[in-house]
Amino acid sequence: MGTMKVGVIAAEMEGRATGVGRYLEGLLEGLELWEHGIEWHLFFQGDPPLSLDFQGGPIHAHYSRHHGSRVLWEQVLITRELEAVEPDVVFGPAYTLPFGLRAPSVVTIHDISFEVLPEEFGLRERWRRRILARRAARVAQRVLAVSEHMAGLLRAQFGLAPGRVAVVPHGIDTKQFSP
C-alpha cells in the first residue's frame, strides 16, 4: 500500500483564523508529531495563511485564488481541485462537504447551534447551515463530534447511526495555556 492522501478543506485557516481555523491548525500540528505516512493536501480558497509553514514535508498547499463566494467555492469549485489530487479521503473540518465528491469523506460538526438556537442566526445563514450540515452528515462516511454530548445530539437531530459518529475531543494549545 502506498502513501495515503488526505484532502483537507482548509479555507477556515485563511486570514484571521476562525475557531474552526484554530481547530484545524492544532489538529495538523498535533499530527505532525506522528510518523504516519500520510500526505496532507490542504485546499485554500484565497491567499496562504501565515500561521503554518508548508515548505516540503507531508503537507502540500493548494491555492485556488477564487475571491468570490465562499459557498460557491466550498460546495462546487473545490470538487475539481480535490479530484485532481485523487485523495483517498476528504476531510471537511467546518460542517460541510462539497457536492459531487467521489472520494470517501469525513466531516466535523462542532455544534448544532443553528438548530437549537435558530434565533441567533439570520434566516439565510440559518438555512444555509442547516442544509449544508445535514447534507454533509448524510453523505460523509464518518461524522466527527467534539464530545459525547454533541455525538448524541447529532445522532438525534440528523438521524445518524451510532457507528457513523466518532468523538474526537478538542485538545489544548500548550503554547498558550499551561498549568
Segments predicted by a language model, with ranges:
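Carbohydrate transferase catalytic cores enriched for Leloir-type hexosyltransferases
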Residues: 1-179
